[in-house]
Amino acid sequence: MTNTDNMSPNFLRNAFRRLTITAIAPIVMTFEPFFIFPVVLITLARRGFVYILLPITAALILRATKVNYGPLTVSPTMHFNTPSIAVFAVLLVATTIASVFKPKLWRAFLVAIVVISILHAATPIESPVKGEGCNKISIELLDSETNFCFYISSAKTGKMWYYHATLHFMDSEGLVVNRVHLLTAALTFSSEVVEFRNEQGKFHAIFYSEVPIDSLKLKLCYFPETVIGSLPVVFCSSVDLEVR
């Protein structure tokens, strides 16, 4: 391609179209509670109907409580850490450069931006709990050590023992895996299985036993949150506990 070709009206028009799509894609993909399916976005881009996205974006801005440009803007419905923002920012810069000079590479980068935006938009928020009065339970996944607060109380009612167990997120350390999000939790004792119920991020289990319980097995199933958002891959871990 010659310098004359680089400055041709057709080249400039196509470059401007790709730049516009690059800027709009993360915004459209991360509005809450609105969502445009990736196939629709990519189809519009391939057909060159980029200006159709402008009124859609304007309408969403009027209805949304806050504009979320991928992980570059934090809103109450999403949370991001420094590695996530750095990865997204580098990818966004690379996509912007590729939109002018490398159209084929630009398409791949654009898809990556859309995927990251969706994963972050789908990442749940859990309020961490202080460690006071907690029995810390740790699980390890790749480079992450995630700690949960576990507490169990008991009382004797007639001939039965009453137990109330609570479980919720404390803190996490890791670069690739930032934390994990619980899906299910269950306690096993004397061949009995008790499922926790999830109440806004805090897990509770109430059960009875004819004899005092001195040991439990806790099974946790969760999915990891990485620098590109939560991954829909389920992992499970088991922890042996003593009841004092």
From Swiss-Prot:
The keyword Ion transport does not apply. It comes from the Archaea. Disulfide bonds: none annotated. It is a multi-pass membrane protein. The chain crosses the membrane at residues 20-42, 49-67, 82-101, 108-125. It is found in: Cell membrane. Keywords: Cell membrane, Membrane, Transmembrane, Transmembrane helix. The keyword Membrane applies. GO terms for cellular component: plasma membrane. This is Uncharacterized protein AF_0399.
